[in-house]
């Protein structure tokens, strides 16, 4: 719609870029109320010139969406869809319109990192700094180890 095009332009994105960000955000979180924040985090990374480093793109590149734990080795797989290795936005899947709208209207924030919560609720901890992120990641890795998730 015209509204979505204007909102995408306000974010410095093409409409198709918003669709791609939305598709990654949907795969990243099963919690619809979190997807706008996740999408905005990826937009922050794009604007900062960072790689997205989005776990769903690794699952897509490997061809296995049942993976529960992304390893460092997995992030090195050679694929144009792997955003740990490649800059920019790859296609993943067609997102819901609501996710697109949630991203376009999400509150601006300074988050650059996220990690699944260690309580396995499906929600994420968000961080503005890499140091904060590492602390959250350690909690999550410890919880995975405690449950024997490889």
Task: Please report, for each region that a protein language model flagged, where it lies by residue.
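Bacterial extracytoplasmic/cell-wall-associated proteins, especially those involved in peptidoglycan
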Residues: 1-150
